[in-house]
A protein has these predicted regions:
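Glycine- and small hydrophobic-enriched segments that form the cores of compact globular domains
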Residues: 1-17, 22
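C-terminal cap/substrate-recognition subdomain and adjoining C-terminal extension
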Residues: 16-160
């Protein structure tokens, strides 16, 4: 994907606590392009960060970090890739409405194999329609196969 998109900057935004950084970094290094990891500052070693983290829900956290990325790169376009397990659709939809034209595409992996997840509600068409309300339907896509994501990214890169 990095080659197809001509080596763009990658940001890995997760609501996971910073304590998981070593594990997540190893995983990223084995499977994904190098990029900046943005994790929650939730640690007993930083009480202020822990309290803030506990008070902020996942969507608020992700939107605030995406706003920060936008402040760094307001003239670049971004592709957001997430999944249906938490609030990626809602976070990306909110940011796409807030910064029209800044997000070039949104791809959401419809996760179906996590037992603890409310798959029916998390993966419902209604949820995705609500999350992306007011956005052009061509901006976002929900997929279940990684090959489909690859095809979409290839097509996006050819569009320029």
């Amino acid at each position: 994907m990095a080659t197809v998109l001509q080596h763009p900057p990658f940001f890995y935004l997760s609501a996971s606590p910073y304590n998981l950084y070593p594990f997540l970094k190893r995983f990223r290094d084995q499977h994904f392009p190098t990029g900046t990891m943005i994790l929650r500052n939730a640690s007993w070693q930083n009480l202020g960060g822990l309290i803030t983290s506990l008070q902020q829900n996942t969507q608020e956290y992700k939107v605030s970090r995406i706003e920060k990325i936008h402040s760094w790169f307001p003239r670049r376009q971004f592709v957001c890739i997430g999944d249906s397990t938490q609030s990626d659709p809602e976070s990306y939809g909110e940011c796409a409405r807030k910064f029209p034209g800044w997000i070039k595409a949104i791809y959401i992996n419809k996760v179906t194999d996590i037992a603890e997840m409310d798959v029916k509600n998390r993966n419902s068409d209604e949820r995705f329609e609500k999350a992306f309300k007011g956005l052009d339907r061509s901006l976002w896509h929900v997929y279940t196969d990684a090959g489909e994501l690859r095809e979409r990214v290839d097509r996006l890169s050819r569009q320029g």
